[in-house]
Regions:
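A periodicity- and composition-biased signal for non-globular, repetitive helical segments
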Residues: 11-12, 97
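A residue-level marker of the well-folded mature domains of exported/periplasmic proteins
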Residues: 2-4, 22-392
Length: 392
């Protein structure tokens, strides 16, 4: 089985280069003199509050990319970073502490956007601005100032469309049978992924089983698959919709443990985790959705810097991504910056992109992206598979 922690390890080098703090309770400052001439005390500070550390991207990508960009554009302004480790109570305490310490802007990726009312109330009471980062805050009567994310319903559509195309190409002779694993119900993004995938697949496949990872854990996906394979057998399904790469790792492990060849059961993913891309190269995972987390994190850092200095204008390099209609969070239409996700497969078929043209071209895991993907220490077959796939 491929190492499911490789993505986090791969980007440690990036984190080191950008000088990000490794502690989930660290406070970073952004340099010695404010280019605007304003002191940190005069403009307040910014708090970056991320939801969990089960998914590798938050500590390995969002945090360092945000921190580096913030350092470069907001010199002299204090940045307070916290990770809630999937605890709503912890995140509330972190937000309240940040506000007490002088934060005037919260960049909040909520553990549970539907129950973030107390955080939003605390921010509102002190006139603190809130950027809803990656996950939309949908708590009743909550109106974050901005929402920055990807088009998350589009993510699900990309997953579903790619899976359907692959299943149809297999000439099964029957309507494809699909096992379906959604993301955490606490995460509004997971709801949007699910909606998009159902839009692409409903009426075109038979959904044999459908459930969700309660906390986005690989082990949760593996447990679901263990039960389902026992129930329906290896011939009872043709493919697997999985909301993210962590879940795909669990599906892969379950299939291998039950003697099911993953190459014969195409599955989806999301996040371009290193082990997932290695599975794609080896043919044991069909696709992933590549989201340029660096772009998302840097956009949030730029906007937070502008807001902490009192600007209401969108930084000029972000205007093209502003959604004209905004995104409705159930209370109001929230001003939104929505970025474009990409479907990635080994061959770029059916409207997808190749690993080489996206993840390699962007050096997503650092300057040694190719050597990490094609590491023979992970799987002796990877170098040859990379060569065959044009990953170089």
């Amino acid at each position: 089985m491929l190492n499911t922690k490789k993505f986090a390890i791969a980007i440690v080098a990036i984190a080191a280069v950008v000088g990000a703090c490794s502690s989930t309770t660290a406070t970073a400052t952004t340099g010695s003199g404010a280019s605007s001439g304003a002191s940190s005390a005069a403009v307040g500070s910014v708090a970056l509050l991320l939801p969990e550390n089960h998914t590798a991207r938050y500590e390995a990508a969002d945090k360092p990319f945000f921190t580096t960009k913030f350092n470069s554009v907001c010199s002299g302004v204090t940045l307070n970073y916290q990770n809630a480790a999937e605890s709503e109570a912890t995140q509330l305490s972190q937000a309240e502490a940040a506000i007490t310490a002088g934060a005037t802007v919260l960049v909040l990726d909520p553990v549970n956007g539907a129950t973030a009312t107390a955080i939003m109330s605390a921010a509102s009471a002190k006139n603190v601005k809130v950027i809803s980062y990656d996950r939309l805050i949908t708590a009743p009567n909550s109106t974050p100032d901005w929402y920055i994310s990807f088009d998350n319903e589009k993510v699900g559509e990309l997953q579903g469309t790619a899976l359907l195309a692959k299943l149809n190409s297999m000439n099964l002779g029957h309507t494809p049978n699909v096992l379906w694993i959604n993301g955490s119900p606490k995460d509004n993004n997971a709801t949007l992924f699910k909606q998009g995938a159902h839009t692409a697949l409903d009426g075109k496949v038979t959904i044999v089983k459908e459930d969700a990872m309660a906390n986005w854990l690989q082990s949760e996906a593996q447990t679901l698959m263990d039960g389902w394979i026992t129930s329906v057998g290896a011939t009872g399904f043709d493919g697997v919709y999985v909301a993210n790469d962590g879940g795909a790792a669990g599906v892969y492990a379950s299939e291998v443990a039950h003697g099911v060849d993953p190459k014969t059961k195409p599955m989806t993913g999301q996040d371009a985790a290193l082990d997932a891309v290695q599975r794609i190269v080896m043919g044991t995972q069909y696709m992933t959705v590549y989201k340029k987390v660096q772009t998302e994190a840097e956009a949030a850092a730029e906007l937070a810097c502008a807001m902490v200095k009192g600007s209401t204008a969108v930084p000029s390099d972000l205007t093209a991504s502003v959604s004209a209609a905004g995104v409705n969070n159930g209370t109001a239409s929230i001003k939104s910056i929505l970025l474009t996700p990409l479907a990635v497969t080994i061959d770029g078929s059916n409207g997808t992109q190749t690993v080489e043209a996206t993840i390699v071209a962007d050096q997503f895991y650092g300057a040694n992206t190719v050597s990490q993907i094609c590491d023979a220490k992970v799987d002796a077959g990877l170098p040859a598979a990379c060569t065959a796939a044009g990953v170089k």
